[in-house]
Amino acid sequence: MDDRTAVALFDDFVHYSNDRGLPIEGVAIGDESHIIAEHHFLSDRTRSIYSHTKSYASTAIGIAIGDGLLTLDDTLDDVVDGDLPEDADPRIAQITLRDLLTMSSGFGDGFLMIPGRRAGEGCPDYLSYMLHKPVAVTPGKDFCYSSADTYLAGRMLEHATGMRLGEYLWRRIFEPLGQGWPVWEHDPQGHAIGGSSIEMRLTEMMKIAQVFLNGGIWAPTGRRIVDAAWVAEATSRQIDTPPSNDDGWSCGYGYQWWLSPYPSAYRADGAYGQISTVLPEQGLVVAIQCPEGDGWERVVRHALHERLLMPLTT
């Protein structure tokens, strides 16, 4: 799609959102190398991108896999060197990195989510807390969205690389993209949550989507960040997601990337509307950031779908 058409549709969405007072902080559209258009309804700021973080964390894992430090078949048992708690469910040893990346660990509930963490869930030791949980279903069988799965995947990366997740992410992703040290939520023992709460500005947040749009290469410098094969695999349907009436939740899930209801499209997606959608056939990325807790998230998501993403892809 040419820039002029994309900008016209973008401007229409901005005017529509302004006219209706939709609670949006900022929205941007770009290709693999630059921002085509950007609008801030409020002053641009660094803010939590919530579960959009998961796509950054899984990319770090994809890099480690490309380096031969991990495989998708490595098991959670490796993190504790085969020394599971005596009362642990024996099926925990069967949970693979693939299961964690596809939200199919088998724990059967959403653990270490925002409300739980704020209430002290998992303290003081998140890893021990999860290793004492029963496995409800066979690992790898059913999708169940849980930030605990991403946290455990991050602990597997730390075990394999000998680095904290934040350091590895900075060295292999943030620094090459020209970004600073990741400000991130950590557990009481200093391990990054993995699945939530990196803080970024709008156009920083969407950089990982621009890298994926370009097959793993950061176009402004020509530097490869992650293997093209990982980009293709991570953004392909790896597991089915439950039926939903909302826009885009039932299209399937990759490795911490949601599939979207547009041709070949996928997205990194965080609570309250922190979203970067990749539209490969149009060569575009659309990113949006929204405020917390106002109850309008579904309205904004639907408007984004109807007024910008659908017109861009039809």
Predicted feature descriptions by range:
Residues 9-43, 276-277, 283-287:
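A short, well-structured edge-of-sheet supersecondary motif
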Residues 42, 134-139, 149-151, 187-193:
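Flexible glycine/proline-enriched surface loops and loop-helix/loop-strand junctions
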Residues 50, 143-145:
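Catalytic tyrosine of NAD(P)H-dependent dehydrogenase/reductases that use a Tyr as the general acid/base
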Residues 67-107, 132, 160-200:
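Active-site helix/loop module of the DD-peptidase/beta-lactamase fold
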Residues 181, 232-286:
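Active-site Gly/Thr loop motif
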